[in-house]
């Protein structure tokens, strides 16, 4: 009894478990707010209507919609971990190539030239060194009694004339067997010469870049002015933005995240050392370190409260002359009536206050990010050495490349009177009117060069000489790109860095480009009905695209109930973005100016279409086309189960990321089997199968099957009979059958005790 009771208990428990644990099936959801990092090519929008802008970017729609997301997301600002920042470096370089496009090879000019230094009418009175008690010229801060106000006249008094030489050379021109003499004016910084050996000061010179394999000169001088643009995500993609107050270029968990279609307008000014005209500036100083710890690549965003600006000028006029060497080779030279004055840049605003705040922010850095001195008086700003672009403040002003030596201004910020090697000058007299390197000034001398080192590729480019007339540009200084260096003297050097990529990290570092993956999997208790199904066609509503991702921070259950609307948002956004891009490509084709960026825009459109078609193809392969919630016949065999009321789709996707391959494979196999079953069902219901019963070959097959069945039955009967016989033989002889009846003798005497003949019996005979 106890044994049977235990069996019933076990069966009861099993039935209870079976009732409480229902079978779950894989369900496909389309329209879930899930994404992954992407490196797809973004496209640009711009409000500028110049030719370059209209042939490379689509017109700005002025849509700055931003939808907050209740999630946490990692962000990284530098190019090696942020594809959007890496794209900016490549794209802005293309902008340079198209607007200041070198196209004429200058290798024939790598020959010996006879050069004579240009002499002008300007005087060359040596400048006197600044001594204690002498007022420093040209400083805006009127609160300091030792400083005076500034104007252009005061600055230009300390600017020397441009050092240049008139060079002549002979080479074959139109007539190849005869040489012709040509004359070209070079800046002294662009040639190297032997010592003068003649009485008239003629020197043998060569181009300083003669050893370079490819040197080209710009075809035309293109006027360069400010171009602002914004990056936009292609259809099917989005931009996430980190809005955390303490974001410093790297944060594993940014909690204040929003989704946008495009970035804010960014500037395309390329500089070394200082950030000009940046789009991101606040009333505070921020220090960004690469990957959160590096001191080799540091971005300092300056406080906009100090109104930091820089005004650069190139005074005077200039005449540009074309020198035709041969057919198809025209070199633009310049002719001086007198030697021109140097260009210069004047730094305005409260730079001392801004630099003091930078020093204070540096010492506040955590110990794992900064191990230098905590004494702000021992933190100094200095410049680098090496290439001219690294050793100087390098930037482009109205199409001309300025190289400005920062020593005077750095001395002013550091309150020192030293040279670039931190040595005090015994005699601070310079050449000509310019003072020596150990003075403090709020302005610096600049040179304009035609041969520059390319900032994106390892090459050099030669551009046309500076344009005629007066050059001037004013820029807002929004940051600095630096390196933090420590030494044994308990001193921290903040060294201006030529890393151009840091500029784009400052502009785009708060954004990340993501690909929307709207297909999700989760277990439900609903199994697909495998009968005939009608395909439902749905027409999307024209709704906001960013609203689709707005549900990223909500629970899975709440998001799943709105999948129809979310998928419509997604499709409507894709269609609208495609329409905008198609209009841009059409405009570019009309102008016959499908530039490199135009091709990128076209590629972005094709990528979006491919992505949408790929998603639909996957859904169709599982039998889920045009469905927002698609139940399947595939059982859910894994232990993972979602918390529909507490878990977001992003969190759930991270749990099952490794299972997606198995899930999709099983869905494809189930769909294939379902198609086979449906095909067999359709064949049974087909009228053409009725006539197949009159096929003679089919009847032969039926007879064959029947004959084999009869043979099988007979064989089984024989085996059974044989088995029965063998079983009886093994049991031995059987006893007499109890059915045989023995009749007794009626008059048998009692012969007990008398011996009888054994076993003899007989019938009695009657006697009369």
Curated annotation (Swiss-Prot):
Domain of life the protein comes from: Viruses
Region (Fusion peptide): 539-559
Site (Cleavage): 538-539
Coiled-coil segments: 650-687
Annotated S-S bridges: 44-57, 103-219, 110-210, 115-167, 232-262, 242-254, 312-345, 397-473, 404-446
Signal peptide as annotated in the record: 1-16
One BP term from GO: symbiont entry into host cell
Region feature V5, mapped onto this chain: 489-496
Entry function: The surface protein gp120 (SU) attaches the virus to the host lymphoid cell by binding to the primary receptor CD4. This interaction induces a structural rearrangement creating a high affinity binding site for a chemokine coreceptor like CCR5. This peculiar 2 stage receptor-interaction strategy allows gp120 to maintain the highly conserved coreceptor-binding site in a cryptic conformation, protected from neutralizing antibodies. These changes are transmitted to the transmembrane protein gp41 and are thought to activate its fusogenic potential by unmasking its fusion peptide.
Name this polypeptide is given: Envelope glycoprotein gp160
Organism of provenance: Simian immunodeficiency virus agm.vervet (isolate AGM155)
């Amino acid at each position: 009894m106890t044994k049977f009771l235990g069996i019933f208990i076990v069966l009861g428990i099993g039935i209870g478990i079976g009732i409480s644990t229902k079978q779950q099936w894989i369900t496909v959801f389309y329209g879930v707010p899930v994404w992954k990092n992407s490196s797809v090519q973004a496209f640009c929008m711009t409000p500028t209507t110049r030719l370059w802008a209209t042939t490379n970017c689509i017109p700005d729609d002025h849509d700055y919609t931003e939808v907050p997301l209740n999630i946490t997301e990692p962000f990284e600002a530098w190019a090696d971990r942020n594809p959007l920042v890496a794209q900016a470096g490549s794209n802005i370089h293309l902008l340079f190539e198209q607007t200041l496009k070198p196209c004429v090879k200058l290798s024939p000019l790598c020959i010996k030239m006879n050069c004579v230094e240009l002499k002008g009418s300007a005087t060359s009175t040596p400048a006197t060194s600044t001594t204690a008690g002498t007022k420093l010229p040209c400083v805006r801060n009127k609160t300091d009694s030792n400083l005076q106000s500034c104007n252009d006249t005061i600055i230009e008094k300390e600017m020397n004339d441009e050092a240049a030489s008139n060079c002549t050379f002979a080479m074959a021109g139109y007539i190849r067997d005869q040489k012709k003499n040509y004359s070209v004016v070079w800046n002294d910084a662009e040639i190297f010469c032997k010592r003068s050996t003649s009485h008239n000061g003629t020197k043998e010179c060569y181009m300083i870049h003669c050893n370079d394999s490819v040197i080209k000169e710009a075809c035309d001088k293109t006027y360069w002015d400010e171009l602002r643009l914004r990056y936009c995500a292609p259809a099917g993609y989005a931009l996430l933005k980190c809005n955390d107050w303490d974001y410093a270029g790297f944060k594993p968990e940014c909690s204040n995240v929003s989704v946008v279609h495009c970035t804010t307008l960014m500037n395309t000014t390329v500089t070394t050392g200082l950030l000009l005209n940046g789009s991101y500036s606040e009333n505070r100083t921020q220090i960004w370190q690469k990957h959160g710890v590096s001191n080799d690549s540091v971005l300092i965003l300056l406080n906009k409260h100090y109104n930091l600006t820089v005004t650069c000028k190139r005074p005077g006029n200039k005449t540009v002359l074309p020198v035709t060497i041969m057919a198809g080779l025209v070199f633009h030279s310049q002719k001086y009536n007198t030697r021109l004055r140097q260009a210069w840049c004047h730094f305005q605003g409260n730079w001392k206050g801004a630099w003091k705040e930078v020093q204070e922010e540096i010492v506040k850095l955590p110990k794992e990010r900064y191990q230098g001195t905590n004494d702000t008086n021992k933190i100094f700003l200095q410049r680098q050495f090496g290439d001219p672009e690294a050793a100087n403040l390098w930037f482009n002003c109205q199409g001309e490349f300025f190289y400005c030596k920062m020593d005077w201004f750095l001395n002013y910020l550091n309150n020192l009177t030293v040279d670039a090697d931190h040595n005090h000058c015994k005699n601070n007299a310079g050449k000509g009117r310019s003072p020596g390197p150990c003075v403090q000034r709020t302005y610096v001398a600049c040179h304009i060069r035609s041969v520059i080192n390319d900032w994106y590729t390892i090459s050099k480019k030669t551009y046309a000489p500076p344009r005629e007339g007066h050059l001037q540009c004013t820029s807002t200084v929004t940051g600095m790109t630096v390196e933090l260096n420590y030494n044994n003297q308990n001193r921290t050097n903040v060294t201006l860095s030529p890393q151009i990529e840091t500029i784009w990290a400052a502009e785009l570092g708060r954004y990340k480009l993501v690909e929307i993956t709207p297909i999700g999997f989760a277990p439900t208790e609903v199994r697909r009905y495998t009968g005939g199904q009608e395909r439902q066609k749905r027409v999307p509503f024209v709704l906001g695209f960013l609203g689709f991702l707005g549900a990223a921070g909500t629970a899975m259950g709440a998001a799943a109930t709105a999948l129809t609307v979310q998928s419509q948002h997604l499709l409507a956004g894709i269609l609208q973005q495609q329409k905008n891009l198609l209009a841009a490509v059409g405009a570019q084709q009309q102008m016959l100016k499908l530039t490199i960026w135009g091709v990128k825009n076209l590629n972005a459109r094709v990528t979006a279409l491919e992505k949408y078609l790929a998603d639909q193809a996957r859904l169709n392969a599982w039998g889920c086309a045009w469905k927002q919630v698609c139940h399947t016949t595939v059982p859910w065999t894994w232990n993972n189960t979602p918390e529909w009321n507490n878990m977001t789709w992003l969190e759930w996707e991270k749990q099952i990321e490794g299972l997606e391959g198995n899930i999709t494979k099983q869905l494809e196999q189930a769909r294939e089997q379902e198609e086979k079953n449906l095909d067999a069902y359709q064949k049974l219901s087909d009228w053409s199968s009725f006539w197949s019963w009159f096929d003679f070959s089919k009847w032969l097959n039926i007879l064959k099957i029947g004959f084999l069945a009869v043979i099988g039955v007979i064989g089984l009967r024989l085996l059974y009979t044989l088995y029965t016989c063998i079983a009886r033989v093994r049991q031995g002889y059987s006893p007499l059958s109890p059915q045989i009846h023995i009749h007794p003798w009626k008059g048998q005497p009692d012969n007990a005790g008398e011996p009888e003949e054994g076993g003899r019996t007989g019938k009695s005979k009657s006697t009369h």
